[in-house]
């Protein structure tokens, strides 16, 4: 968790950007793994809730009343039976105090807060929900059907959150650097142990274990597959074959939930064939070009299409494409070899903002 001052400053900036009304930031709830009585999936807090309220516990809602300059952390304290299973945890009031929030209230108070705001015809801001339990909660509070909630979400709040989360502070950059180190260790672990005869699943497990061993977790489900033509190929029980390439797409998430994401392709037996090396070298050239060009003030699309042209030129040299490169890229022919964007923003979500 960052300092109390960090979360306080973020909420103050958010209030200035949104200007008026009440902001509801829903934290996530525990999600059953495969049944209500059979364990729970590892809990991951909503990133925007984390950004402004910092707490990682389930079942919380942050309320920011801009007009009355009042902030409240909503949630129920655990009871004695919960303590038997989960141990003693901070009260909601304690958690509020940790992040500079002066008020706390049980979950039943949220209905009263929202009802009062609706009665006064005040603006109520929420972000587009992505979990169905939160969609039901919003429907229960605001009477908005889940199918209509994306359109009903506050554009002012969306723009403000995107603006703030898109620009990283120094402490966030340090977290991203930590995430990059974890990702590096995951990839080098994969490279070190990959060899013919192992299964994709085994190596994938070692990759995930590396992330966990550094006190973190994976930032998304690890992709490790000999079928690099399938962009999101999960590790299977297939044996690694001598002479083939394997694609590894993985990343780590720090304890503060900042993410890394890198993709590398390498030979299973440690040595490229001539053809593999030729194609790899085209990708490496494009990679180095992007690193050299990308800097503040340069448009992402200029870097993306510059890379597309390098790749198409390379494919022409290898006899895998033909035609005028400029026209081919304009018509989208490069998508035969690069069927996706060059990259994406990083932050608390692996595809940030």
Q: Where are the regions a protein language model picked out?
A:
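Active-site neighborhoods and metal-handling regions in enzymes and metal-associated proteins
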Residues: 1-353
